[in-house]
C-alpha cells in the first residue's frame, strides 16, 4: 500500500535531482512531543499521473477503525504540521491520511527550485486525490478534509465521482487573486515567464515570519511549528508562488465553482467568523452544506490556540462520526472493506 519500493528508488535520486520527493527527515530540536509523529506513522508516495510523486502519511487508531479521514494539505502545509491533529483523530477511532499537493511539502517538484510554488495546473492534484481515495485507502466510510488552497481540488474530486461520505472544508480558499494580479500573471506566462516567483522577495527564510507573525494563529507555540520543520529539513521549505501557480489556482477555483452543485454528500465548512473571502456563497451552492464559523479564530484552525482549536476539532470529529454512521455497506458487504 505504501509503495515502499518506489519510495526507496526515488530516495536514491535525492543527490542528483532536487525535484525528487522527500520521504522522512530530521525532527526539529526541542519540538514538543505533541508535534511528533503519531504511533505507527508511515510514509508513502503516489504517482498515478506520470508527473512528480505526491507524498502522503498515515496513522491508525489502537483499536478497530471506525472511519478513514483523508486530509488534503494546503499550500506550504507539509504533512508534519498535521501530526497533532492526526493523533487526536486517531484517538477517536479514525485512520488519518495526509496527502500533500504535488510540488509542496515532501512531494516531488515541477521546478528545480524546491521553495518555489510552481504548477501549471492543479488537475494532477485532483487526479491524485481521487487515486488516493480509490486505490490506496480503498474503503468506506471515508471523510475528506481539505485545508485552505486544497478546497477547490477536493470539490472537483468529489463532484467527479470519488466515493466519500463527508467533506470538510477548513478555512477554504475559494477565491482567486485579484484581477490585477491575474492579469499580470497571464501576461508574464504568455511571455514565457510564468516560472518566476510573483514576489521576488518571497523566498523561504529561516528568519520567518512564522505563522503567528503572519496572523494565521494566536498560538505562539503552534505558530512556530511550520518554521521549525522547514528549518530542520530544507526539502520541506516553501516560499511564495510563481505566476503560473497563481493562474493554476484561479483555474481550479473556477472549475470548483462550476462543480459545487454536483457535490452529492454532506459538507461542513469551518472558517473564522470574519473571513474576508467567506465560502458562504459556495456552501449555498452545494446541496447538503453547513457553514459553522469559529468565532474569533484565525485561518490556521489546526494550529490555533486551544480556545479555538478545541471547538474546531470537536466539530471535525462530530461531523466525521455522523458521516461515518450514515454509510450503508452494500448487501453482504462489510462496513470497512479491506484496503487494496
Give each language-model segment a name.
Residues 72-77:
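Active-site glycine-rich loops that stabilize anionic/oxyanionic intermediates
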Residues 79, 86-111:
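Conserved alpha/beta-hydrolase
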Residues 115-135:
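Alpha/beta-hydrolase active-site loop
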Residues 149, 153-237:
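Alpha/beta-hydrolase-fold enzymes
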Residues 240-259:
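Active-site nucleophile elbow and catalytic-triad environment of alpha/beta-hydrolase enzymes
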Residues 263, 269-271:
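Short beta-strand/loop motif that positions the catalytic acidic residue
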Residues 289-340:
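Catalytic active-site module of serine/aspartate enzymes centered on a nucleophile-bearing elbow/loop
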Amino acid at each position: 500500500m505504501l509503495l515502499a519500493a518506489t519510495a526507496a528508488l526515488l530516495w536514491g535520486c535525492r543527490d542528483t535531482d532536487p525535484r525528487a520527493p522527500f520521504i522522512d527527515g530530521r525532527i526539529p530540536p526541542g519540538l514538543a512531543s505533541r508535534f511528533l509523529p503519531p504511533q505507527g506513522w508511515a510514509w508513502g508516495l503516489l504517482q498515478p499521473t506520470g508527473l512528480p510523486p505526491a507524498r502522503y502519511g498515515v496513522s491508525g487508531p489502537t483499536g478497530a477503525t471506525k472511519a478513514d479521514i483523508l486530509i488534503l494539505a494546503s499550500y506550504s502545509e507539509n504533512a508534519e504540521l498535521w501530526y497533532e491533529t492526526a493523533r487526536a483523530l486517531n484517538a477517536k477511532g479514525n485512520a488519518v491520511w495526509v496527502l500533500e499537493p504535488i510540488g509542496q511539502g515532501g512531494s516531488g517538484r515541477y521546478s528545480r527550485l524546491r521553495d518555489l510554488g510552481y504548477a501549471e495546473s492543479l488537475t494532477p492534484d485532483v487526479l491524485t486525490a481521487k487515486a488516493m481515495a480509490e486505490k490506496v485507502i480503498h474503503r468506506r466510510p471515508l471523510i475528506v478534509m481539505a485545508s485552505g488552497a486544497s478546497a477547490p481540488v477536493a470539490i472537483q474530486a468529489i463532484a467527479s465521482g470519488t466515493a466519500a461520505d463527508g467533506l470538510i472544508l477548513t478555512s477554504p480558499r475559494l477565491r482567486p487573486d485579484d484581477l490585477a494580479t491575474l492579469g499580470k500573471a497571464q501576461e508574464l506566462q504568455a511571455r514565457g515567464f510564468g516560472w518566476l516567483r510573483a514576489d521576488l522577495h518571497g523566498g523561504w527564510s529561516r528568519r520567518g515570519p512564522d505563522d503567528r507573525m503572519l496572523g494565521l494563529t494566536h498560538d505562539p507555540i503552534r505558530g512556530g511549528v511550520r518554521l521549525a520543520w522547514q528549518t530542520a529539513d530544507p526539502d520541506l521549505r516553501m516560499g511564495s508562488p510563481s505566476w503560473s501557480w497563481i493562474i493554476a489556482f484561479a483555474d481550479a477555483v473556477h472549475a470548483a465553482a462550476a462543480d459545487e452543485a454536483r457535490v452529492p454528500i454532506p459538507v461542513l465548512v469551518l472558517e473564522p467568523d470574519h473571513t474576508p473571502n467567506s465560502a458562504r456563497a459556495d456552501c449555498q451552492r452545494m446541496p447538503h452544506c453547513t457553514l459553522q464559523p469559529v468565532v474569533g479564530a484565525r485561518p490556521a484552525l489546526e494550529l490555533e490556540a486551544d480556545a479555538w482549536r478545541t471547538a474546531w476539532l470537536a466539530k471535525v470529529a462530530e461531523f466525521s462520526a455522523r458521516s461515518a454512521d450514515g454509510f450503508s455497506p452494500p448487501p453482504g458487504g462489510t462496513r470497512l472493506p479491506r484496503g487494496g
